[in-house]
């Protein structure tokens, strides 16, 4: 072995080296010769985006899965790409133009779109570079963009097909309207903020009845101008006698009826609601049931229109003030209450969203939703954790038609064409320039573009070449698993299942792995306004990418949120250094002539008990790792490999084997030890690689010219877990651990050598202690250890039971008993006080109901640790008391 690694682990140097080498060697391209396939498509990030903590978690999980399957010899395709992000990208470019005092409308549509493409090619896609920094093993040669020619072809084919079936239509419905951007936006782009507002109780005069009113409460009095009825519950006895009553709509010359519908909650407020079908989704549905004609009182820019009478031209919020002043002047406000309610805002600009009646393009979604429900019910698609299936079904059963048109310029233009001459209308997959009815060239395309989600719902098969029947499509569809957050189950996951079932007659993936969010250590969502946002690139630079990736996986409980605790990152950086230093120790003790041949039959016959033990411990680690992998329990996988490398391998085996590695025993024993050291390290690196790709590749490169990314997945060793050698080493480990605990509990200084007596008549204990006396003295920091079944235990002795007898640690002369007892009593008092505070906190209903579940769980873990600590301290005091 001529190669060596550096004195210190320098993450940035190692990361830059391997990012370049992997790409140069095309290490992540699928193996076309493999019989089995494994594929994942990355949820396409926005072209405007940068890597945030959610991306880092999501992509790390996917990379772990992909790297494992690649090492298992499968043809692995992890397909990257970006979403054109219609409104987000258009807003970015418009902001750039504003710096030059220009507006979008200063350009033709074609000129503006050209500018967006220029921005995309020059400044967009920053996230791609950041994904490489995270170590993502995607096949970059297959990167896709939702506006690519092939993907656009798929979009137009799907639109035409759904339109021809009557599943896409143009109609008038309530949508989320942004007056600032003057476009419809998706539900996902509406951010609901808790807002301190007012609840206005307005008197509606009964027509023809002097001084008789019905009181209706509203938070949006300006929309009252568009009321077409007031509604009560048909079972509300307060109003059943008023069935034929007509009301004077305040501030207008109109009369509106009092009607009855069961959707009204008779327990809320006065039990009456205003019906404004053009400005409220529930009112629109009620209006359709009751045969009411909507009345729109607002312009697209948020000003009041001609139907608002004297308020025409006023901004909606100015109109609110004027309406309230006029109502007050007429004595038509009964009362005003403070009211906290959720107000929808455009997440990309902050403007208050209006529920707005508009003519748009819609997908008749129920028939498609039924296909998705059937796919999940039949087991073709499995949600992990399973609890998310219930959420999925609830959403699907209450789904409404989907507004797919956006009043933007950037995006897939709706493939519908209108002839100005003969009024002929048609939908076509290809551009129409000549009317197919009259031959006129006066054909206008629809001005709107499609919702970004329309193209991204086709992502699993459009990226593989559909509608063409490509080899990629045949081999990699359906994909193996989708990894995503719960927040887009409705917006993206469900729609992908619908489209897969509709156009591929198969779901787009077999499993949907739902992970939680990353929150701050107090359980709060990361938010720029709160100021608690964590930049993953900063963390990667500070602690190393491998430490950061391992943290994300190791702290990810199934289906729950991660609480971001930066101190854990420091611990995993230490883990990286531990691996590096241990690897360096092994390499330094390998001669230039050493060749790692593994555990061959020739080596196997000369294995010593400590060798058999570490091989069995690796087998146990591998079993736990594989079991956790089958359940997507990444934290258990991380725990298994962490405990094996740090505990079994570094802290135990390397310490035990040092005399042999140093050549202080027979040459054959040294040779076997070095083969075991190197082979166990190589296999452990193979398990760790999906979590820590950079460090493992660097260390592995010393042993082999083949990159670890494509070496076979580690296998178990042919060693029995209950062999005599393994039993002896398990017993040795137990004895050393017990002695270490006794030393700690009794305050014995680390540099003080102790004398220990073992009371046991068991032959295994005797042979283990005699054969490993040197190791025992070294590992437990002992002056001596002897077996004495007749030893009489003294008052000042500390005693601990192990599986084969008792371990006695005489404390006389070793510590100042009175001083140590006082220290333990002080520590006990402090711990009991902390324990009491935590118990009070965890019995407080307010804390339990308001705190995030992860925070509550963290506090419970703290309490459990304190309870254990209190017991240990009491035991220590009891020992010292004799």
From Swiss-Prot:
Its EC number is 6.1.1.9. Disulfide bonds: none annotated. A motif ('HIGH' region) lies at residues 45-55. One of its GO terms (molecular function) is aminoacyl-tRNA deacylase activity. Its main location: cytoplasm. It catalyses: tRNA(Val) + L-valine + ATP = L-valyl-tRNA(Val) + AMP + diphosphate. It comes from the Bacteria. Pfam families: Anticodon_1, tRNA-synt_1, Val_tRNA-synt_C. InterPro entries: aa-tRNA-synth_I_CS, aa-tRNA-synth_Ia, Anticodon_Ia_Val, M/V/L/I-tRNA-synth_anticd-bd, Rossmann-like_a/b/a_fold, tRNA-bd_arm, tRNAsynth_Ia_anticodon-bd, Val-tRNA_synth_C_sf. Gene3D superfamilies: HUPs, Isoleucyl-tRNA Synthetase, Domain 1, Valyl-tRNA synthetase, C-terminal domain. One of its GO terms (biological process) is valyl-tRNA aminoacylation. GO terms for cellular component: cytosol. Monomer. Catalyzes the attachment of valine to tRNA(Val). As ValRS can inadvertently accommodate and process structurally similar amino acids such as threonine, to avoid such errors, it has a 'posttransfer' editing activity that hydrolyzes mischarged Thr-tRNA(Val) in a tRNA-dependent manner. Belongs to the class-I aminoacyl-tRNA synthetase family. ValS type 1 subfamily. ValRS has two distinct active sites: one for aminoacylation and one for editing. The misactivated threonine is translocated from the active site to the editing site. The C-terminal coiled-coil domain is crucial for aminoacylation activity. This is Valine--tRNA ligase. It comes from Leptospira interrogans serogroup Icterohaemorrhagiae serovar copenhageni (strain Fiocruz L1-130). The gene is valS.
């Amino acid at each position: 072995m001529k190669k060596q690694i550096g004195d210190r682990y320098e993450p940035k140097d190692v990361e830059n080296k391997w990012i370049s080498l992997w790409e140069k060697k095309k290490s992540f391209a699928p193996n076309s010769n493999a019989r089995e396939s494994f594929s994942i498509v990355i949820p396409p990030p926005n072209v405007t985006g940068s890597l945030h903590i959610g991306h880092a978690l999501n992509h790390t999980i996917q990379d772990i899965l992909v790297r494992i399957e690649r090492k298992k010899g499968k043809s692995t395709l992890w397909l990257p790409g970006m979403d054109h992000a219609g409104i987000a990208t258009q807003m970015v470019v418009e902001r750039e133009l504003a710096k030059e005092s220009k507006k979008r409308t200063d350009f033709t549509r074609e000129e503006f779109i050209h500018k967006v493409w220029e921005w995309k090619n020059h400044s967009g896609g920053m996230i791609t570079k950041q994904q490489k920094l995270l170590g993502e093993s995607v096949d970059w040669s297959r990167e896709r963009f939702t506006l690519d020619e092939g993907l656009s072809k798929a979009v137009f084919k799907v639109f035409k097909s759904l339109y021809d079936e009557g599943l896409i239509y143009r109609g008038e419905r309530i949508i989320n309207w942004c007056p600032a951007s003057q476009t419809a936006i998706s539900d996902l782009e509406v951010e609901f903020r808790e807002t301190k507002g007012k609840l206005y109780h307005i008197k509606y005069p009964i027509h023809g009845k002097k001084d008789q009113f019905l009181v209706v409460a509203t938070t949006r009095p300006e929309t009252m101008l568009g009321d077409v009825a007031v509604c009560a519950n048909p079972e509300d006895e307060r109003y059943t006698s008023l069935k034929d009553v007509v009301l004077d709509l305040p501030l207008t010359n109109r009369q509106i009826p009092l009607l009855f519908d069961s959707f009204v909650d008779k327990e809320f407020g006065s039990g009456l609601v205003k019906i404004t079908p053009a400005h409220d989704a529930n009112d629109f549905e009620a209006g359709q049931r009751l045969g009411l004609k909507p009345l729109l009182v607002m312009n697209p820019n948020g000003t009041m229109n001609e139907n608002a009478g004297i308020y025409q031209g006023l901004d909606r919020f100015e109109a609110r003030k004027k309406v309230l002043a006029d109502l007050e002047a007429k004595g038509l406000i009964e009362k005003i209450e403070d009211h906290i309610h959720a107000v929808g805002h455009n997440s990309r600009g902050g403007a208050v969203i209006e529920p707005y009646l508009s003519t748009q393009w819609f997908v008749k979604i129920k028939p498609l939703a039924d296909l998705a429900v059937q796919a999940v019910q039949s087991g073709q698609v499995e949600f992990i954790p399973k609890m998310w299936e219930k959420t999925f079904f609830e959403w699907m059963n209450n789904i409404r038609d989907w507004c797919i048109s956006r009043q933007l310029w950037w995006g897939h233009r709706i493939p519908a064409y209108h002839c100005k001459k003969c009024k002929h209308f048609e939908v076509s997959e290809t551009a129409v320039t000549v009317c197919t009815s009259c031959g006129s060239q006066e054909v206008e395309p629809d001005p709107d573009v499609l919702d970004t989600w329309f193209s991204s719902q086709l992502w699993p098969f459009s990226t593989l070449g559909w509608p063409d029947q490509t080899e990629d499509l045949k081999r990699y569809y359906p994909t193996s698993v989708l990894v995503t957050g719960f927040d887009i189950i409705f917006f993206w996951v469900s729609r992908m299942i619908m489209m897969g079932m509709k156009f591929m007659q198969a779901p787009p993936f077999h499993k949907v792995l739902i992970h939680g969010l990353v929150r701050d250590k107090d359980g709060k969502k990361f938010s720029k306004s709160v100021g608690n946002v964590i930049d993953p690139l900063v963390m990667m630079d500070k602690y190393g990418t491998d430490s950061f990736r391992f943290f994300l996986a190791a702290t990810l409980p199934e289906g729950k949120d991660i609480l971001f605790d930066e101190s854990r990152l420091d611990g995993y950086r230490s883990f990286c250094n531990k691996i590096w230093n241990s690897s360096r120790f092994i390499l330094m003790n390998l001669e230039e002539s050493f060749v790692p041949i593994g555990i061959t039959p020739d080596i196997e016959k000369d294995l010593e008990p400590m060798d058999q033990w570490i091989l069995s411990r690796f087998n146990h680690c591998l079993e736990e790792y594989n079991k956790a992998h089958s359940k997507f329990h990444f934290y258990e996988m991380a725990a298994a490999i962490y405990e094996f490398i740090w505990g079994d391998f570094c802290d135990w085996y390397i310490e035990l084997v040092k005399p042999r590695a140093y050549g202080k025993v027979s040459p054959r024993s040294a040779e076997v030890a070095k083969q075991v050291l190197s082979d166990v390290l190589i296999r452990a690196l193979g398990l760790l690689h999906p979590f820590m790709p950079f460090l493992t590749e660097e260390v592995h490169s010393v042993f082999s010219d083949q990159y670890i990314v494509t070496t076979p997945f580690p296998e178990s060793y042919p060693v029995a877990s209950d062999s005599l050698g393994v039993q002896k080493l398990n017993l040795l480990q137990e004895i050393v651990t017990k002695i270490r605990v006794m030393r700690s509990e009794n305050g014995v200084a680390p540099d003080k050598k102790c004398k220990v007596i073992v009371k046991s008549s068991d032959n295994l204990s005797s042979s283990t202690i005699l054969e490993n006396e040197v190791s025992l003295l070294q590992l437990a920091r002992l002056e001596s250890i002897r077996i004495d079944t007749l030893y009489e235990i003294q008052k000042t002795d500390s005693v601990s039971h192990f599986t084969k007898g008792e371990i006695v640690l005489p404390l006389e002369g070793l510590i100042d008993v009175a001083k140590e007892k006082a220290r333990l009593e002080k520590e006990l008092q402090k711990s009991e006080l902390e324990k009491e505070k935590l118990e009070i906190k965890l019995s407080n209903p307010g804390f339990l109901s308001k705190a995030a579940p992860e925070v509550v769980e963290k506090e419970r873990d703290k309490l459990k640790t304190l309870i254990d600590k209190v017991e240990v301290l009491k035991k220590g005091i009891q020992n010292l008391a004799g």
